């Protein structure tokens, strides 16, 4: 029988544990983790994501600030704003909500964030640390998926893992984290030949391709673990993932739903990394 991986329940459990750790940290050291989120413009989806991050930070007992700036902000002004928070020791995590307006160079913005405060894990230095086997900040979606594997007792060693999607945010770091657990990893994408046949060999299938219900039953080996990172709308406007859930769920040993699967874990891992960044400042004193 298929086991549903309940990301919402797991995130709530971890969030509760994080609030306890934060309270203890404050009591013992006086340190309160601080997270600042910079939102450029008024993209409706970005506003929802930022609101959720702020809510989670406050629930964890963090100091939280959302800096809203107009879409007309210049790149130089945005970089100056980031520099201000880089230099302020009260803030341990800095997030710039993506996407950014076209006139702003996204890479320049990510490079401007202090790697020790880059809780998204997108800075090239943190990517390099991950690929060299010494991760500090890990992109939060792959980190959340790894936590799911751990919580549900899913063994990765020696397993065939297929990742569909090669983004720097999910696909590439996901592949590296699976490799670190001794899985045999195939990283695929939309131009992979015979993609369904490649995917059908997977014991572990992680799908992050950004296409509604792209993965159907012929992509999935019976008994596979299926992780759906997608967040799309179907033809009826209903939220759905990159996996055709109704067709695939009966085949899988474990599967994440959309919504309520990977999404809640992403924000929880952002909070955990902010907490860890705060802890590391104690080590540097």
UniProtKB/Swiss-Prot annotation:
Organism: Streptococcus pneumoniae serotype 4 (strain ATCC BAA-334 / TIGR4)
SUPFAM superfamilies recorded: Aminoacid dehydrogenase-like, N-terminal domain, NAD(P)-binding Rossmann-fold domains
Chain positions recorded as NADP(+) binding sites: 165-167, 190
Superkingdom of the organism of origin: Bacteria
Pfam families found in the cross-reference section: THF_DHG_CYH (PF00763), THF_DHG_CYH_C (PF02882)
Protein name according to UniProt: Bifunctional protein FolD
GO molecular function terms noted in the UniProt entry: methenyltetrahydrofolate cyclohydrolase activity; methylenetetrahydrofolate dehydrogenase (NADP+) activity
Xref: PANTHER family: C-1-TETRAHYDROFOLATE SYNTHASE, CYTOPLASMIC (PTHR48099:SF5), C-1-TETRAHYDROFOLATE SYNTHASE, CYTOPLASMIC-RELATED (PTHR48099)
Any single GO CC term annotated in Swiss-Prot or TrEMBL for this entry: cytosol
Alphabetized InterPro entries for the sequence: Aminoacid_DH-like_N_sf (IPR046346), NAD(P)-bd_dom_sf (IPR036291), THF_DH/CycHdrlase (IPR000672), THF_DH/CycHdrlase_cat_dom (IPR020630), THF_DH/CycHdrlase_CS (IPR020867), THF_DH/CycHdrlase_NAD-bd_dom (IPR020631)
Cystine connections: none
EC number per UniProt: 1.5.1.5, 3.5.4.9
Catalytically driven reaction(s): (6R)-5,10-methylene-5,6,7,8-tetrahydrofolate + NADP(+) = (6R)-5,10-methenyltetrahydrofolate + NADPH; (6R)-5,10-methenyltetrahydrofolate + H2O = (6R)-10-formyltetrahydrofolate + H(+)
PROSITE patterns: THF_DHG_CYH_1 (PS00766), THF_DHG_CYH_2 (PS00767)
Function comment: Catalyzes the oxidation of 5,10-methylenetetrahydrofolate to 5,10-methenyltetrahydrofolate and then the hydrolysis of 5,10-methenyltetrahydrofolate to 10-formyltetrahydrofolate.
């Amino acid at each position: 029988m298929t086991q549903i991986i309940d990301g919402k329940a797991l995130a709530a459990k971890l969030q509760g544990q994080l609030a306890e750790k934060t309270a203890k940290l404050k009591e013992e050291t006086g340190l309160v983790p601080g997270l600042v989120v910079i939102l450029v413009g008024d993209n409706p989806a970005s506003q929802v994501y930022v609101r959720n991050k702020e809510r989670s930070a406050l629930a964890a007992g963090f100091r939280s600030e959302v800096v809203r700036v107009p879409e007309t902000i210049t790149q130089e002004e945005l970089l100056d704003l980031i520099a201000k928070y880089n230099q302020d020791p009260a803030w341990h995590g800095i997030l710039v909500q993506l996407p950014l307006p076209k006139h702003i160079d996204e890479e320049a913005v990510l490079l401007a964030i202090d790697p020790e405060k880059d809780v998204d894990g997108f800075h090239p230095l943190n990517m390099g640390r991950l690929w060299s086997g010494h991760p500090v900040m890990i992109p939060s979606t792959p980190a959340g998926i790894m936590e799911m594997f751990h919580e549900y007792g899913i063994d990765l060693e020696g397993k065939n893992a297929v990742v569909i999607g090669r983004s720097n945010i999910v696909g590439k770091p996901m592949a590296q984290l699976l490799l670190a657990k001794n899985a045999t990893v195939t990283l695929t994408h939309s131009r992979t030949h015979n993609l369904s046949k490649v995917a059908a060999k997977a014991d572990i299938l992680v799908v992050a391709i950004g296409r509604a219900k792209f993965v159907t039953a012929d992509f999935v080996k019976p008994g596979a673990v299926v992780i759906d990172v997608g967040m799309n709308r179907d033809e009826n406007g209903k939220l759905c993932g990159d996996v055709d859930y109704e067709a695939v769920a009966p085949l899988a040993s474990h599967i994440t739903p959309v919504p309520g699967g990977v999404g809640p874990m992403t924000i929880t891992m952002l909070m955990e990394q902010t907490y860890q960044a705060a802890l590391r400042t104690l080590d540097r004193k």
